[in-house]
């Protein structure tokens, strides 16, 4: 949100060192070969084609030669202006005539100059030349016939340069807080080791989803709305005035310093004849924005392919807007809402031609750009000057780099993250926006009246181009006042010069110095994001060989490439924890500053319910609760996008990779969980459970190493909620799912060692529990049967590694060739006849049970039986000396409390408090949740401190 800062000076103030007036009355002369043609266009005149025009303006002891060419590319072919209210009429004919008005170009063949003017009703617009900005417009008392004659037609040319002498301190004109959000941190992270941007492209029709790290043209289809106050103030010139503002904003977005090819395209202009037909506009800027966003959403077309569909909407009003703390507000918009039909909109308080800069600034917020003075921008790019578009105190635009490096980096990440995919379709009928500088259409006097009201005049002795000082009254006295905006581009500032972006510059030929950009060589690959387990290295190239200039095309194609590195497994991978789990655990003890969570909170990854766009954010759930948060804007490069996928995250985007960890590899896991395998190293185990008893019923024990697990419970006769529910326990007998007669109705992710099981929830006709990757711990599947005891139908299948000496000829099989498991007991219906020479009896030991304690010294037990060859028990037949152990010691050291140093006292005198970090550390130094340590022995974490008396 832009805020307005008005400085007031006495009328007699004169800039120190200024010896020449800051405006002159001039007569533009057309100097191109077709000197017999029309010199200015009027509505209804014939089109002169795409020929170039040259105008000479002599002022300020120099000649300005404006080399102009038609430029209406910011108007969609289907552009139309429509009145809503009384009278109701379409003005398409007038809109078509306006396409011929707008020209753009350069001054005196100067590469850094700039001109954007309208030739309708005289020369009106702005241009910049050698550090000064010029605004030109016909004198108000000049008749239309005079303005059409070859060498007649008085115009007012105003020059604005750097401000000299006393001036008011500019205040922020934008109410958007100069803070940061996770998206900004993510956007700037790649730039921390360097302070350069990335490249982009030129125009070409595209559609669909954008590729990551690729420069692609974007087309911002725009609705422009003017309320009743604008209609009354501007009258018949309103449409031309609005398009002049949008033409200036569009040219700013085509500047290469934004590092992206952004094309502002107006698809429709709505002029509201009375207040009842439009949104409710009040002095409350935030409320007006909300009203306008809701109103424009109802008018927009459903399909992006419709010629009049818009991606963003802009409301212009003369209403004095007020922000939260001041009524100096000039504009307001939500941050990062481009392509959101409900919120991609902005509100602009019209204060004359400088509103073009307000429009570009607020649209920058819609593109997720913060102010340049936010801390994260300064940390990466250093302290930025206050003359870029996203400065909160916009005064004078840097003509060479209107967009800061921070703004370019953030909009690049915003578009690369898929937030600008609605901008990929090129309008079928764009409205042509004026390319003439606004100073050629609006005189200094007109600029003052637009900014400060009827009767306001330019103050004498203004410094050229920098700030527009206009007369006004304060406490009955005549004063000079400014809103810290420069003169409009195109205002003359001397002989052969005009104002451009706050500087007085020479005129030049636009086409002679046009330079298309080209890619430079690839920079070296950076460091690997991980030391083991599969990291990523990045390399970039810049559009700097050469850098596009003077309207030249930007580079198109891939600007960032990547490769895998350090693929060897990490030593800690044997624990079964994923890299994402480790990143979540790093936040253990952080309660997100909410009283809903304790400082003993432990964080685990959240997978279910996460949109594909957010897979590479570090979204973690507080273990044992339903609360989840984005703890980091992106995971470390090389982190798996999902636990059942081999794709990895690169700069916050999910990129395809093979199971070998290599980006671009096509290797896949087979059903056995073997990378690049042929499905021959494992066997399939299937089974069916249909006869339950009330309560929990054992279904199957799934050993460690099982992969491609698929368990389904079909509702009785297709019913949802047939009172049968899947349950899951770990090897310690702890329920991981639907235990203690409490079931989960929603989708859940169950994190186990080595894998994640996806649970469908109970709200489906087919309740499912699935995992693709091998599990590294045994699990037990049960079914909870309650209520009417309708028969369940639980089918399960999974794959187990084959034993090295397994003999397939003696393996029982079902008719389909797969071993069949009935409640974890192999079917022996097809058992092969046993030979007569049976082996002797042997000891058979079961699996070790859980440890009797969770930590410390405990015992484990197991069953040991003597079995003869038919499987019958008979302890006397076995050798007692070789009997296996039935008990053994177990237990790891208990977690301990680890203390840090006390913090300084919270007060410098009197009674305050101090605190020290406290962590629960397990065996091997692993950070645990606090509830896993002995809370009865928890050391004091917070204490009072008393210093000297105050």
Swiss-Prot record:
Which stretch carries the motif Cysteine switch? Answer: 172-179
What superkingdom does the record give?
A: Eukaryota
The intrachain disulfides are 293-345, 322-327, 339-422, 377-406, 448-470, 459-480, 465-499, 493-504, 528-565, 532-570, 543-555
- Kindly provide the PTM information from the record: The precursor is cleaved by a furin endopeptidase.
Tissue expression, as annotated, is: In the adult colon, highly expressed in the muscularis externa (inner circular smooth muscle and outer longitudinal smooth muscle), muscularis mucosa, submucosal glands, crypt, villi epithelial cells, goblet cells and lamina propria. Expressed at perimuscular and peritendious areas in the developing limbs.
Enzyme Commission number(s):
3.4.24.-
Which controlled-vocabulary keywords does the entry list?
Answer: Cleavage on pair of basic residues, Disulfide bond, Extracellular matrix, Glycoprotein, Hydrolase, Metal-binding, Metalloprotease, Protease, Repeat, Secreted, Signal, Zinc, Zymogen
Region listing for Disordered, in residue ranges: 144-172, 798-822
One cellular component (GO) term of this entry: cell surface
Compartments where located: Secreted, Extracellular space, Extracellular matrix; Cell surface
Which Pfam families does the UniProt entry name for this protein?
A: ADAMTS_CR_2 (PF17771), ADAMTS_CR_3 (PF19236), ADAMTS_spacer1 (PF05986), Pep_M12B_propep (PF01562), Reprolysin (PF01421), TSP1_ADAMTS (PF19030), TSP_1 (PF00090)
The cofactor note from the UniProt entry for this protein is: Binds 1 zinc ion per subunit.
Q: Which residues form the propeptide?
A: 19-212
Residues in the active site?
A: 362
The GO terms this record gives for MF are:
endopeptidase activity; extracellular matrix binding; heparin binding; metalloendopeptidase activity; zinc ion binding
**What's the protein called, per UniProt?**
A disintegrin and metalloproteinase with thrombospondin motifs 15
Tell me which InterPro entries the record gives.
ADAM_Cys-rich, ADAMTS/ADAMTS-like, ADAMTS_ADAMTS-like, ADAMTS_CR_2, ADAMTS_CR_3, ADAMTS_spacer1, MetalloPept_cat_dom_sf, Pept_M12B_ADAM-TS8
Q: What is known of its domains?
A: The spacer domain and the TSP type-1 domains are important for a tight interaction with the extracellular matrix.
């Amino acid at each position: 949100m832009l805020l307005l800062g008005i400085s007031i000076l006495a009328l007699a103030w004169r800039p120190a060192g200024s010896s020449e007036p800051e405006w002159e009355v001039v007569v533009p002369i057309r100097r191109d070969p077709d000197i017999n043609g029309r010199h200015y266009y009027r509505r209804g005149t014939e089109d002169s084609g795409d020929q170039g025009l040259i105008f000479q303006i002599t002022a300020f002891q120099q000649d300005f030669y404006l080399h102009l060419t038609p430029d209406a590319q910011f108007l969609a072919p289907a552009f139309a202006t429509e009145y809503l209210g009384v009278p109701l009429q379409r003005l398409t004919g007038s809109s078509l005539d306006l396409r011929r008005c707008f020209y753009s170009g350069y001054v005196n063949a100067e590469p850094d100059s700039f001109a954007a003017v309208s030739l309708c009703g005289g020369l009106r617009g702005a241009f910049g030349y050698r550090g000064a900005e010029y605004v030109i417009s016909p004198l108000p008392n000049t008749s239309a016939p005079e303005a059409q004659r070859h060498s007649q037609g008085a115009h007012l040319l105003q020059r604005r340069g750097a401000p000299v002498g006393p001036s008011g301190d500019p205040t922020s004109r934008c109410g958007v807080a100069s803070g940061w959000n996770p998206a900004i941190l993510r956007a700037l992270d790649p730039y921390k080791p360097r302070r350069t941007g990335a490249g982009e492209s030129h125009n070409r029709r595209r559609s669909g989803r954008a590729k990551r790290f690729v420069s692609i043209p974007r087309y911002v289809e725009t609705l422009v709305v003017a309320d009743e106050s604008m209609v009354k103030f501007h009258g018949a010139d309103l449409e031309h005035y609005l398009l002049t503002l949008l033409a200036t904003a569009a040219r700013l977005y085509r500047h290469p310093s934004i590092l992206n090819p952004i094309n502002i395209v107006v698809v429709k202009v709505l002029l509201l004849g009375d207040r009842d037909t439009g949104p409710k506009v009040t002095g409350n800027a935030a409320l007006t924005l909300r009203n306008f966003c809701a109103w424009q959403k109802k008018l927009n077309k459903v399909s992006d392919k419709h010629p009049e569909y818009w991606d963003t909407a802009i409301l212009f009003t003369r209403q004095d807007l007020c922000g939260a703390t001041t009524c100096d507000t000039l504009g307001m918009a939500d941050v990062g809402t481009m392509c959101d039909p409900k919120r991609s909109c902005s509100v602009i308080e019209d204060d004359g031609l400088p509103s073009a800069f307000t429009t570009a600034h607020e649209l920058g917020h819609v593109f997720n750009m913060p102010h340049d003075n936010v801390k994260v921008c300064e940390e990466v790019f250093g302290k930025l000057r206050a003359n870029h578009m996203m400065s909160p105190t916009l005064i004078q635009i840097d003509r060479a780099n209107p967009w800061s490096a921070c703004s370019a980096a953030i909009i690049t990440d915003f578009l690369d993250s898929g937030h600008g995919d609605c901008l990929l379709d090129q309008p079928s009928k764009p409205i042509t926006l004026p390319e003439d500088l606004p100073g050629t259409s609006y005189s200094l006097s007109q600029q003052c009246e637009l900014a400060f009201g009827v009767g306001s005049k330019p103050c004498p002795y203004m410094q050229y181009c920098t700030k527009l000082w206009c007369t006004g009254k304060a406490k009955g006295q005549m004063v000079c006042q400014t809103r810290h905006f420069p003169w409009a581009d195109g205002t003359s500032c001397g002989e052969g010069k005009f104002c451009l972006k706050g500087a007085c510059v020479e005129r030049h030929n636009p086409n002679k110095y046009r330079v298309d950009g080209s890619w430079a060589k690839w920079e070296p690959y950076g460091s690997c994001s991980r030391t083991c387990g599969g990291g990523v290295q990045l390399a970039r190239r810049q559009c700097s060989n050469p850098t596009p200039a003077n309207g030249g095309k930007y580079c198109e194609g891939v600007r960032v490439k990547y490769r895998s590195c350090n693929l060897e497994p990490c030593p800690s991978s044997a624990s079964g924890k994923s890299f994402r789990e480790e990143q979540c655990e790093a936040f253990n003890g952080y309660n997100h500053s909410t009283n809903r969570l304790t400082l003993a909170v432990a964080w685990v990854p959240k997978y279910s319910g996460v949109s594909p766009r957010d897979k590479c954010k570090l979204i973690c759930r507080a273990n044992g609760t339903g609360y989840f948060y984005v703890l980091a804007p992106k995971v470390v490069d090389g982190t798996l996008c999902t636990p059942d996928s081999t794709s990895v995250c690169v700069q916050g985007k999910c990129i395809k990779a093979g199971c070998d960890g290599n980006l671009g590899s096509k290797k896949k896991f087979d059903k056995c969980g073997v990378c690049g395998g042929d499905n021959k190293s494992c066997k399939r185990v299937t089974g069916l459970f249909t006869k339950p008893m009330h309560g929990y019923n054992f279904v199957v024990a799934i050993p460690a190493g099982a992969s491609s697990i698929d368990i389904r419970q079909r509702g009785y006769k297709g019913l949802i909620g047939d009172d049968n529910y899947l349950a899951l326990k770990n090897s310690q007998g702890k329920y991981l799912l639907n235990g203690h007669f409490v079931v989960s109705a929603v989708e859940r992710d169950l994190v186990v060692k080595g894998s994640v099981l996806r649970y469908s929830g109970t709200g489906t006709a087919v309740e499912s529990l699935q995992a693709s990757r091998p599990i590294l711990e045994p699990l037990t599947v049960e079914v909870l049967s309650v209520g009417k005891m309708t028969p369940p139908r639980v089918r399960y299948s999974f794959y187990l590694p084959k034993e090295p000496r397994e003999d397939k000829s003696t393996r029982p099989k079902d008719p389909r060739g797969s071993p069949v498991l009935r409640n974890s007991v192999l079917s022996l219906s097809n058992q092969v006849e046993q030979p007569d020479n049976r082996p002797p009896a042997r000891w058979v030991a079961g699996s070790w049970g859980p440890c009797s304690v969770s930590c410390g010294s405990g015992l484990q037990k197991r069953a040991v039986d003597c079995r003869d060859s038919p499987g019958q028990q008979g302890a006397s037949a076995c050798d007692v000396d070789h009997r296996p152990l039935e008990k053994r010691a177990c237990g790891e050291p208990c977690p301990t409390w680890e203390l840090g140093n006390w913090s300084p006292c919270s007060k410098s005198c009197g009674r305050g408090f101090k605190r020290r970090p406290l962590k629960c550390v397990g065996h091997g130094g692993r950070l645990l949740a606090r509830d896993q340590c002995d809370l009865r022995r928890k050391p004091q974490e917070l204490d009072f401190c008393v210093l000297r008396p105050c």
